[in-house]
Amino acid sequence: MSVQAPSVPDLRQQVHDAARRARGAARALASLSTETKNRALCTAADHVLMNTRTILDANTADLDAARAAGTPEAMLDRLALNPARVEGIADGLRQVAGLPDPIGEVIRGRTLPNGLQLRQQRVPLGVVGIVYEGRPNVTVDAFGLTLKSGNAVLLRGSSSAARSNAALVNALRAALATEGLDTDAVQLLPSEDRASVTHLIQARGLVDVVIPRGGAGLIDAVVRDAQVPTIETGVGNCHVFVHESADLDMAEEIVLNAKTRRPSVCNAAESLLIDAAIADVAVPRLTGALTAAGVTVHADPSEDELRAEFLSMDIALAIVDGVDGAISHINEYGTGHTEAIVTTDLAAAQRFSERVDAAAVMVNASTAFTDGEQFGFGAEIGISTQKLHARGPMGLPELTSTKWIVWGDGHTRPA
């Protein structure tokens, strides 16, 4: 007997039922002690490791299907797991357990002249939806950060990673059950039908925020169609600007690291800007180094290439007139992610840092450092490229809201 896929109304009901269960779990999570959450995170790390073979077998099946479908190598790298990566995923959970708990943190407080005592403190957001592409590590990163910040999470991953994500979520839910916690604190939504994304991002009143992680097409679609608040993350047309004062040895190392370390991630450099004052020397040296490393340099880039997030061994080259030319170019073509300047001129560095519109600005450092772990936040939920309510690598504080608590002593407000 064949089994029919659920109809669209059935899928909508399925997603909304999951969201309702998540709301119940979120209410319980909000009042958990830090000790309980940390113990659950460490248990989750243990369960991930105990299920390494199952997880890797599932990932192998995903990779085989992706290769058969002609998936580009850069995307296969994002999808792939191995024993070291699984161990890294488990370590990430333990790192989150070691981070300060943001819930209950008092941000500010004061006593009013009438004697009322005010304090503003952090509280969980509630139910967080994550829509993401073929990166299984996001499954566990999202779980770890949402659990520690007292939120429930609804995960809608890519169909290309469906088996890997299911194996990981099964391990995480088993860990929650071991600790006597509500397993609906983490749920994996169906990935076979794209309508599940629509039902998630339009579940107003059930989902508190949706965070899309992936390429420009995914992010634009979620932001455009969502009826719940969204936090835009990740599209990275990151530039490295080599100023006329730059040490070219340093510039070469930074450019190569920013482009070639992991070209498929959002903090990889996609554009190289060279000051016209040193173009005669810097262009052949830096493009030669990139070419030798296997990078295709687009020396006469089209408008589309100047705006591209290649996510591959490609980089656009542009010559600009000094620091102001670089600032103007970046503010036209950048995506607000990470921008870097290589310079020995303090004034140029300060001008660039102040006037470039980006979540992170690197001075004499690779764009690859824009990362929650590198910033000391532990795992990250994403890198926000918007300005409200979070910007840059999103750690635990960015997964909270605030509540005002006011203490009185029979206070009433005069007419």
UniProtKB/Swiss-Prot annotation:
GO terms for biological process: L-proline biosynthetic process. One of its GO terms (cellular component) is cytoplasm. One of its GO terms (molecular function) is NADP binding. It catalyses: L-glutamate 5-semialdehyde + phosphate + NADP(+) = L-glutamyl 5-phosphate + NADPH + H(+). SUPFAM superfamilies: ALDH-like. Its main location: cytoplasm. PROSITE patterns: PROA (PS01223). NCBIfam families: PRK00197.1, proA. This is Gamma-glutamyl phosphate reductase. The gene is proA.
